[in-house]
């Protein structure tokens, strides 16, 4: 049976998480993760000490037509930054977890928009 692209993406993601867990310096950093489907884009902040998601944003919250494009993904960055400010997390250092996706398209647009807001990763 032929394995799908999504299967290999999950294998990459597990490999990345193993590296993050083994590195002591990265254990003290919050993780910004992304997930993309065909129609929507999701981003979350993960707390490594409590092992849970602190806050998240997605294009499901927006009401502007088709939400699976680069413009919609990059428009989520200010929303996530507002939530980070509300939780006093804007000055923390982060790890950008691309979840096995290529750093291209929606993932890259979101990361660059978040860097423009002043987030360091």
From Swiss-Prot:
One of its GO terms (cellular component) is ribonucleoprotein complex. GO terms for biological process: translation. One of its GO terms (molecular function) is structural constituent of ribosome. Pfam families: Ribosomal_L18p (PF00861). InterPro entries: Ribosomal_uL18_bac-type, Ribosomal_uL18_bac/euk. Keywords: Ribonucleoprotein, Ribosomal protein, RNA-binding, rRNA-binding. Belongs to the universal ribosomal protein uL18 family. Part of the 50S ribosomal subunit; part of the 5S rRNA/L5/L18/L25 subcomplex. Contacts the 5S and 23S rRNAs. This is one of the proteins that bind and probably mediate the attachment of the 5S RNA into the large ribosomal subunit, where it forms part of the central protuberance. This is Large ribosomal subunit protein uL18. The lineage of its organism: Bacteria, Bacillati, Mycoplasmatota, Mycoplasmoidales, Metamycoplasmataceae. The gene is rplR.
């Amino acid at each position: 049976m032929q394995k799908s692209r999504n299967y290999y993406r999950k294998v990459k993601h597990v490999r990345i998480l193993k590296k993050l867990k083994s590195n002591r310096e990265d254990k003290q950093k919050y993780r910004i993760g992304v997930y993309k489907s065909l129609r929507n884009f999701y981003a979350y902040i993960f707390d490594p000490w409590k092992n849970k998601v602190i806050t998240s944003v997605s294009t499901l919250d927006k009401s502007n037509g088709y939400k699976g494009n680069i413009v919609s993904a990059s428009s989520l960055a200010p929303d996530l930054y507002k939530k980070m400010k509300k939780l006093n997390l804007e000055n923390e250092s982060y790890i950008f977890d691309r979840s096995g996706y290529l750093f291209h398209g929606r993932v890259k647009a979101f990361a660059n928009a978040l860097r423009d807001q002043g987030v360091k990763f």
